Every structure is written in C-alpha cells, then in structure tokens.
From Swiss-Prot:
Organism, as annotated: Chlorobium limicola (strain DSM 245 / NBRC 103803 / 6330)
The protein's name: Thiamine-phosphate synthase
Source species taxonomy: Bacteria, Pseudomonadati, Chlorobiota, Chlorobiia, Chlorobiales
Binding-site residues, 2-[(2R,5Z)-2-carboxy-4-methylthiazol-5(2H)-ylidene]ethyl phosphate: T131, S132, S133, G162
Binding site for Mg(2+): D67, D86
Molecular function per GO: magnesium ion binding; thiamine-phosphate diphosphorylase activity
Length: 210
C-alpha cells in the first residue's frame, strides 16, 4: 500500500552507506525508502535490502528496490521501482504477483498511461526541477506538468528531480501524492534533520489546504 499523501520517499545515494542513510531518513519521518545502487553486485544488494527492509518494518515504512525484481523478491521487499529501460512492467508484475508494489519512472503523459495500463501502482514523474542526478540535457518538466499527468491516470504520482525544502510544496500543490529526494537528504549535514524538515513542509501543505 502506498503511504498516505503527502509523503516523503528517500532514494539512497551511492556515495554513502545506504543502510545509514535509510535509517536517518526513517528517523526523520520518511514513509518510503528506495534502494538504488547501480554499481553494487547482487550479493551486496541483497544484504542491504534485508537490512533496510527490517528498518522499514520497524518504522512502518515502505521499502522499494530499484530495478532488481529478483532482489526485491529474495529480500522480501514491499516492491520494486522500474525505469523505462528495465524489465517490462507486465513481465515484472507476473513475477511480483498482485500484492507487491510496482512503481515506474515516467517523463510524459504517454509513459504514465502505459505504466498504469501495465499494472503500476504509482509513477515516479520528473525530473521536476534541474538536478545533478539526471541528464542535464533534458529540460525539467516543471511542477505545473503534474496536473496534466494527474488528469489522465488514477494511480499516485511521486514527483522527483531537484526537490528541496525551498520547492517541496509545489509538486504536492500541483497534485503529486509524494516527493522523492536523494541529495536533499543524503548530502545534508544531518540527513535525519533534513528529512524531518521536508516532512514538516509537507505537513504544512496539509494545513494550507484545510
């Protein structure tokens, strides 16, 4: 089950220990953790996944593995997040079954429609703002484009890309269910405090809409 909106998803940073970062983000109030480490081998990913899943259960949070359906299943993760060039969504759904979460990265309305059709439980949409973790040649889609996606799909949208404490409210106000961050937490002097501040900003958005 996707966390209640609005929520913070933290994606691990390859430059630091994913277990330490996940723990800090969870202690700061993150509701979802995604393990993303392109260069790690299967053995390392599995052991990280087992450890992070245990942390997520302790904090009643969702644990997602990036790309690797096999690791997600072996470690008992809550789900998997797939990119456009990863295992096809319909094939992944057959392996995952109906109970595990499947998210898909999208950057256009057509990709979002296809993701929902192929069984995605949520889409990660972006990049919303300029970011160092994505191809800088690609133009940011901007928070206003979230409304276009929300108008054509029924599954939750997680906004990603260049989100910081200064702009975190904009994707939520545009219709995103949550925000996903890497650097805003991982590269902060204190990742726990950074996560807590982002969660606080999201909570203020709830109060703003009352």
């Amino acid at each position: 089950m996707i966390p209640s909106s609005p929520f913070l998803c933290f994606i691990t940073d390859e430059s630091r220990s994913p277990i330490i970062l996940a723990r800090k983000a969870l202690e700061g109030g993150a509701s979802m953790i995604q393990l993303r480490h392109k260069s790690a081998d299967g053995d390392q990913l599995y052991h990280w996944s087992v450890a992070i899943q245990a942390l997520c259960r302790k904090h009643k949070a969702i644990f997602i593995v990036n790309d690797r359906v096999d690791i997600a299943l072996a470690a008992g993760a809550d789900g998997v997040h797939l990119g456009q060039q990863d295992l096809p969504a319909d094939a992944a759904r057959k392996l995952l079954g109906k109970d595990r979460i499947m998210g898909i990265s999208v950057s256009s309305p057509l990709e979002a429609l296809a993701a929902e059709k192929n069984g995605a439980d949520y889409v990660g949409f972006g990049h919303i703002f300029p970011t160092s973790s994505k191809d800088k040649k690609n133009t940011p889609v901007g928070p206003e484009s979230i409304a276009d996606i929300k108008a054509i799909i029924t599954i939750p949208i997680i906004a990603i890309g260049g989100i910081t404490g200064c702009n975190a409210q904009l994707p939520i106000r545009a219709g995103a269910a949550g925000i996903a961050v890497i650097a805003a937490v991982s590269r902060a002097a204190d990742p726990e405090i950074a996560a807590r501040e982002l969660v606080g900003i999201l909570q203020k958005n709830i109060e703003h809409n009352r």
